[in-house]
Amino acid sequence: MIIEIITIFPLFFKSFCETSIIKRALEQKKVQIKLHDLRTYSKNKHNQVDDSVYGGGVGMLLSFPPFFDCLQKIKTPQSKVILLSPQGKIFNQIHATNFAQKETHLIILCGNYEGVDARILQYIDAEISIGDYVLTGGEIAATVLVDAITRLLPEVIKEQSFLEDSHQQGLLKHPQYTRPQSYLNHEVPAVLLSGNHAKIRCWRQKESLKATLQKRPDLLENKKLTLEQTKLLTEIKQELQK
């Protein structure tokens, strides 16, 4: 996959691209990340890419021409163009999975200041937000998208690792433990030490449902549960009512 990011702060992504899974994915050529400095597309002698808002208002707006000219240069018929904006649809694991599985070329536009000139909207395919709050710029949101999508690409991480992630199956992940087995009377649940894989699987399933019910009950509203999950969820609700 090729991911191209249009930004006025390309250096923001330097450490991000040199860290952890993203670094490994780049080295193994599972993904290419190309940064485009919006200022290089400015026709202003000072490389200015923002201006005041027509009709009055506070703050500065990123101009239309630099974005348009950059898109004209890098966009292909296979491109999916994404504008990061607080007005966009909330990004979730389903979006990440769809992008990873269906797209080969993503172009991410990072807004800043008061946003972007609305004329760019007719040249994008999706407007995405990472939450109902406002950030200084789209760069932080861009790293969220790139990380969430890249880890789902083939051979970036073991498939079983992300299949067990929270949200990947529509539920939160079960609690996990590591050594030591006991510390100041804080014990690892005995079932995880039993070696009984059937009981461990059942415990994890139940704890996953319990965590989802307690922390994100909204995820259960449209979730199609198996008969086993339905039975476990009933048990959990009865236990919590005691």
Swiss-Prot record:
Gene3D superfamilies: 3.40.1280.10, tRNA(m1g37)methyltransferase, domain 2. GO terms for cellular component: cytosol. The keyword Nucleus does not apply. S-adenosyl-L-methionine binds at G111, I130, G131, D132, Y133, V134, L135. The keyword S-adenosyl-L-methionine applies. It is found in: Cytoplasm. InterPro entries: Alpha/beta_knot_MTases, tRNA_m1G_MeTrfase_C_sf, tRNA_m1G_MeTrfase_TrmD, tRNA_m1G_MTases_N, tRNA_MeTrfase_TRMD/TRM10. Its main location: cytoplasm. It catalyses: guanosine(37) in tRNA + S-adenosyl-L-methionine = N(1)-methylguanosine(37) in tRNA + S-adenosyl-L-homocysteine + H(+). Keywords: Cytoplasm, Methyltransferase, S-adenosyl-L-methionine, Transferase, tRNA processing. Its EC number is 2.1.1.228. One of its GO terms (biological process) is tRNA N1-guanine methylation. Pfam families: tRNA_m1G_MT. GO terms for molecular function: tRNA (guanine(37)-N1)-methyltransferase activity. Belongs to the RNA methyltransferase TrmD family. Specifically methylates guanosine-37 in various tRNAs. PANTHER family: TRNA (GUANINE-N(1)-)-METHYLTRANSFERASE. Homodimer. This is tRNA (guanine-N(1)-)-methyltransferase. It comes from Onion yellows phytoplasma (strain OY-M). The gene is trmD.
